[in-house]
Amino acid sequence: QKLWRPAAIKGYAYPFIDSGILRQTLPYLTSLCVFSYGFTEDGRLIPPKTDDRWMIGEAKANSVRPELTLTSLNEQDQFDNLLIHALLHDEERKERLIFALLNEMKEKGYEGLDLDFEYVQAEDRDAYTRFVARLTERMNVEGYPVSVALAPKTSDDQRGILYEGIDYA
């Protein structure tokens, strides 16, 4: 016997998306993940180059949850696992980033956080897991759900930089 469960459908979009395409897509989504915010080496938030407020408004007008997507993109718009490493091993940077995220989400009206860190180093696996737990706890206290984007994994012992730094369990 199969149990019915509602599906949550997320869509990622850059703030420079054509507004007509966004409006056509929103009725099919549960959440709109605005792509993306990055961060600096010292833990400051890097917003998208194009204003994202209009997307948040469109999402809410269509009963879709707008989510801030935090990536490991650096100031050159490249995924940077050294940036992740530096963040994960510095309490002050983590606190600065979490504080900045909470402020940005409150100010702009985001209703959730999607974490999309690419290329977490294998040696950072446990530190990343602790960071996700801490970030989730802080966000949940403020009423924000947190999701983590993951590369598809086909086995427990799968090798590769997309998998080894992530504790899928």
Q: For the regions a protein language model found, what residue spans apply to each?
A:
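Chitinase-like catalytic core of GlcNAc-active glycosidases
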Residues: K2-F16, L26, F39-A169
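Short acidic active-site motifs
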Residues: G20-I21
